[in-house]
C-alpha cells in the first residue's frame, strides 16, 4: 500500500463522503469501543460498594452511640413501658429530676417542687447520690433532708433518714454539691433539686 492510500485510510473518518468507512463501522476502531462500557460499569460497582460500606459505617456509629452510653444515661429503665419525665426533667433510676437554675430558700424550693407533684430530692441509694453530686457540680443544691429541733433527720416525703451517709454541719437543712453533703441555714438561697417517681 502506498503512502497516499495509508493517508486516506487513516483520515477516512474525517471525510465520510469520500466513500470510505467511517470509524463507527471500521474494524480498526471496533476494539476501542468494545471495552468502553466495562470501565463505567466497574466504576458504578465500586461506587455502590463504597456507598454501601459508608452507610453501614454510619449505622454502626449511630447504634454504637446508643449502645455505649456514658456513665450516666438519662433513659427509661427496661422495665418501664412509657417515658414520663416532663420537659426540663431528667430521668434516672426510675425517678424524674429537676435541677433548678435559680436560687431559693429551702422552704420556697420545696414549694416549687410541690407545684410539679414532686419534693426536694430524696436520695435512696449510692447511685442516686453519685448521680446528683455529679449533676450538681460545684454549686450547692438543696435536697429534701431537714431536721427539726429535737427530732431526727427526715426526708421531704416524710420518711425518716436512716443515716446511710454523713451530713456535716449543725444547721437544719441539707444541701449537696460534688464534694460534700452538708447542712446550712434553711433561709439561705441556693439552687435546688426536685424528684418524683416515673408516672
Swiss-Prot record:
Cysteines joined through disulfide linkages: 85-96, 113-194, 173-186
Positions of glycan attachment: 166
GO cellular component: external side of plasma membrane; plasma membrane; protein-containing complex
A GO molecular-function descriptor: molecular sequestering activity
A Pfam family assignment: Lectin_C
PROSITE patterns: C_TYPE_LECTIN_2
CDD domains the UniProt entry points to: CLECT_NK_receptors_like (cd03593)
Entry comment on modification after translation: Constitutive Ser/Thr phosphorylation in both mature thymocytes and activated T-lymphocytes.
Sequence ranges assigned to domain C-type lectin in this UniProt record: 92-195
Topology class, membrane: Single-pass type II membrane protein
GO terms for biological process, alphabetical: cellular response to xenobiotic stimulus; negative regulation of T cell migration; negative regulation of T-helper 17 cell lineage commitment
Tissues where the protein occurs: Expressed on the surface of activated T-cells, B-cells, natural killer cells, neutrophils, eosinophils, epidermal Langerhans cells and platelets.
Segments passing through the bilayer: 41-61
Region (Disordered): 1-29
Induction annotation: By antigens, mitogens or activators of PKC on the surface of T and B-lymphocytes. By interaction of IL-2 with the p75 IL-2R on the surface of NK cells.
Keywords linked to the UniProt accession: Cell membrane, Disulfide bond, Glycoprotein, Lectin, Membrane, Phosphoprotein, Receptor, Signal-anchor, Transmembrane, Transmembrane helix
Gene3D superfamilies the UniProt entry points to: Mannose-Binding Protein A, subunit A
Claim: DNA-binding is one of the keywords in the record: no
Entries under InterPro entries matching the protein: C-type_lectin-like, C-type_lectin-like/link_sf, C-type_lectin/matrix_domain, CTDL_fold, NKR-like_CTLD
Side of membrane Extracellular, spans: 62-199
Subunit structure: Homodimer; disulfide-linked. Interacts with S100A8 and S100A9. Interacts with galactin-1/LGALS1. Interacts with S1PR1; this interaction mediates S1PR1 degradation.
Protein name per UniProt: Early activation antigen CD69
Organism: Homo sapiens (Human)
Gene, per the UniProt record: CD69
